[in-house]
A protein has these predicted regions:
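Conserved acetyl-CoA-binding loop-helix of GNAT-fold acetyltransferases
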Residues: 92-118, 122-127, 138-140, 304-324
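Contiguous mid-protein beta-loop-alpha structural module that forms a pocket-lining wall or clamp
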Residues: 104-227
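Amide-forming acyltransferase catalytic core, primarily the GNAT-like/NAT-type
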Residues: 174-295
Length: 402
């Protein structure tokens, strides 16, 4: 049997027929990605994302001779966290259950990466370009999202979240094996939260640059250049805001969410020494029943003081999660035990406390449990495998994935 490669991108493939085909693709992959949503609701939300011209996305998919869609991958470009860098997120990886164990998605991923990096269309075995494949539009789209100066600099990285362990290592992706997800289920929430205005502050999207730059609070920076997408964090502000807004649009979160979703973090100062500060950022995860704390900064030296800070952060995070989840359609089908707050020790930034000490403090705070690598493994691949040693993610990679 032979298989044909197709592509659709939301910059040039916007005809009525293109949109109709895109809906079929979303319906096909919905069994793996819709969660509690009805297929039609999943289609509607994803089509909003596809039809949002301010964002960029491209799908490649294989069809069998009988017209079945058998494998799918989506490539989403994101501004890198270093200036002048780009992150290509490999997502929506899907194989039709009737066509599994044939290596089809592996062939598709290899072809897509090679096509992006070299422009060639070499094929593996029984795969060919579909007769309707619009190569000129496809190349024009890639040129649009990959400016020539970035391509020449090779400051491009592929990233993904794997739910199949290190499977993607065969494509050159390096796992962030030191990621340990520490989780708190909603049935263990303490939502008795009231802001202590003398020592605490809710952080908002409007002034996130002020909080994120460490100079104001003398908080540490990560400066190891090998840790891609980690240093020079002040470069993340436009990308963070863009990704956050994308999440709101994707999930149809309107007025009710904005009241609570305007907050992006929590600042707490020492009660006796105001110079001792901890900042925790918070954001919805791409699984709608999960909330992630994607970065924690502290200059606190004493573990007991930090434990107090974390207890307050936990109460804030539980309050935030409850408010946000109450506004998301279809979450009523989830039990509290399936609603989760997440943080990783690799997202902890401190010059005085170790990541192990951070993990120990968290897991000694009511209800938090270390789940190890958990449900997702962040992975990264250098453009053309050009770096020696290869880049690695110094944190959970979440900033790259939203």
């Amino acid at each position: 049997m032979s298989y044909s490669i197709h592509q659709l991108n939301n910059k040039f493939n916007r005809s009525d027929n293109d949109l109709k085909t895109m809906k079929v693709v979303y319906a096909t992959i919905s069994s793996s990605f819709k969660g509690p949503l009805e297929t039609s609701d999943f289609q509607h939300l994803e089509m909003q994302h596809y039809e949002d011209y301010t964002a960029s996305t491209q799908f490649f998919y294989l069809t069998a001779e009988n017209g079945d869609i058998v494998s799918v991958v989506e490539i989403v470009p994101r501004q890198g966290l270093h200036q002048g860098t780009l992150n290509l997120l490999l997502t929506m990886v899907f194989t039709n259950p009737d066509y599994r164990k044939r290596g089809l998605v592996a062939k598709l991923i290899n072809w897509v990466i090679n096509f992006y990096e070299t422009g060639t269309t070499d094929f593996d075995g029984a795969i060919k370009l579909a007769d309707c494949f619009e190569m000129d539009q496809c190349r024009e789209y890639i040129s649009l999202i990959l400016p020539e100066e970035i391509v020449k600099s090779e400051k491009i990285h592929w990233t993904l979240y794997s739910i199949v362990g290190e499977y993607y290592a065969r494509f050159g992706f390096n796992p962030c094996n030191d990621t340990e997800w520490i989780e708190l289920c909603a049935d263990n929430f303490d939502v008795d939260f009231e802001l202590k205005e003398d020592t605490e502050k809710l952080l908002t999207m409007d002034n996130i640059p002020t909080y994120f730059t460490a100079q104001k609070y003398n908080l540490p920076h990560i400066e190891d250049e090998r840790f891609n997408n980690c240093a020079l964090e002040e470069a993340t502000f436009p990308g963070f805001v863009q990704r956050y807004q994308s999440y709101l649009n994707l999930n149809g979160l309107k007025e009710e969410f904005s009241e609570h979703g305007k907050y992006c973090g929590f600042l707490i100062s020492g009660e006796l020494d105001a110079s001792q500060k901890t900042i925790a950022f918070i954001c919805p995860f791409f699984f709608m029943n999960r909330i992630v704390i994607p970065r924690v900064y502290t200059n606190v030296r004493d573990k007991n003081i930090f434990k107090h800070h974390w207890e307050r952060i936990s109460k804030f995070a539980a309050w935030y999660a409850k408010q946000v989840w109450a506004t998301i359609p279809n979450l009523s089908d989830y039990e509290d035990a399936d609603k989760v707050l997440m943080v990783t020790s690799s997202d902890f930034v401190s010059e005085t406390l170790t990541r192990q000490e951070f993990a120990d403090v968290i897991t000694s705070t009511g209800g938090w449990e270390n789940r190890g690598q958990g449900i997702v493994l962040p992975m990264i691949r250098d453009w053309k495998l050009s770096r020696k040693p290869p880049s690695r993610l110094a944190h959970s990679g979440y900033w790259s994935f939203m």
